[in-house]
Amino acid sequence: MASYLDFEKNIQQIDEDIINAQIKGDTEAVSILKKNLEKEISKTYKNLSDFQRLQLARHPDRPYALDYIELILNDAHEIHGDRAFRDDPAIVCFMGYLGEKKIIVIGEQKGRGTKDKIARNFGMPHPEGYRKALRVARLAEKFQIPILFLIDTPGAYPGIGAEERGQSEAIARNLYELSDLKIPTIAIVIGEGGSGGALAIGVADRLAMMKNSVFSVISPEGCAAILWNDPAKSEAATKAMKVTADDLKSQGLIDDVIDEPTNGAHRNKEAAAVAIADYVKKSLNELENIDVRELSANRMQKILKLGAYQEA
């Protein structure tokens, strides 16, 4: 059963009317309603607010890393474990083919359904998850296979056990190691890009965001609680923080924005997957013509420019 956000109520009503008309066998009404649905979707999604895009980034029906892996990879095989503590299901790693190109995909997976969400810790990786990602990244470098990172997490897990096992060290180690990989790397924020939990697999030659994704150092709710002592002001915080793909592109913090289907990735996963696959293929064609040492140097220069400013 589809899930609807508060600003999608008109869409929900038309969807329900279509189902009722189909049950009655009223083909003429179905045809008219589908045209009305297209108009309503176009109207609803034409001028989304920052807060509405945040809601879409968290939409329960939004495609996750495993959905995209299933849709874009052929002959995919999962790689498990960090070879030090355990296999963290919040991070998934696959080797497969994107068209004719061999590629490794490393993604953060939130999980669907109560049991899966709990098993995957709601997409909040432990340090062993980031160490698994790094182990697989080193394998990719060893065999000269490009990497696609799919970012989608509310943040790295802040529990006591995670901190005892070195959460901050694991994130810092990934930032250090991934910045110097001698292979082409691409990172895409497909939903939520939550702080260090996102950055830990976000150091790449190309950093892109899906149109309805967000990337921030703290959740808008957390920001509102700290600045105004009122989590209910999260909508104002979302706007002030400039967390959307267009905001971050305008500030030079990401390289590209990947357009989603008009009705959002959650209503057309296949089209969203095609958009990602096309972007990755195009980017790899560009990156594979650059010497790997130059890639590493360019990556480092891009990192050093982050946060730079000029006084007026």
Swiss-Prot record:
Record key words, sorted: ATP-binding, Cytoplasm, Fatty acid biosynthesis, Fatty acid metabolism, Lipid biosynthesis, Lipid metabolism, Nucleotide-binding, Transferase
Localisation: Cytoplasm
Reactions catalysed, as given in the entry: N(6)-carboxybiotinyl-L-lysyl-[protein] + acetyl-CoA = N(6)-biotinyl-L-lysyl-[protein] + malonyl-CoA
Pathway in which the depicted protein is active: Lipid metabolism; malonyl-CoA biosynthesis; malonyl-CoA from acetyl-CoA: step 1/1
Pfam families: ACCA
Annotated EC: 2.1.3.15
Residue intervals of the CoA carboxyltransferase C-terminal domain: 36-286
Signal peptide positions on this chain: none
Any one GO molecular-function label of the UniProt entry: acetyl-CoA carboxylase activity
Intrachain disulfide bonds: none
GO biological process: fatty acid biosynthetic process; malonyl-CoA biosynthetic process
One Gene Ontology cellular component annotation held by this UniProt entry: acetyl-CoA carboxylase complex
Stored HAMAP family: AcetylCoA_CT_alpha
Subunit: Acetyl-CoA carboxylase is a heterohexamer composed of biotin carboxyl carrier protein (AccB), biotin carboxylase (AccC) and two subunits each of ACCase subunit alpha (AccA) and ACCase subunit beta (AccD).
Record's function text: Component of the acetyl coenzyme A carboxylase (ACC) complex. First, biotin carboxylase catalyzes the carboxylation of biotin on its carrier protein (BCCP) and then the CO(2) group is transferred by the carboxyltransferase to acetyl-CoA to form malonyl-CoA.
Similarity section: Belongs to the AccA family.
Name listed for the protein in its UniProt record: Acetyl-coenzyme A carboxylase carboxyl transferase subunit alpha
Gene that produces this protein: accA
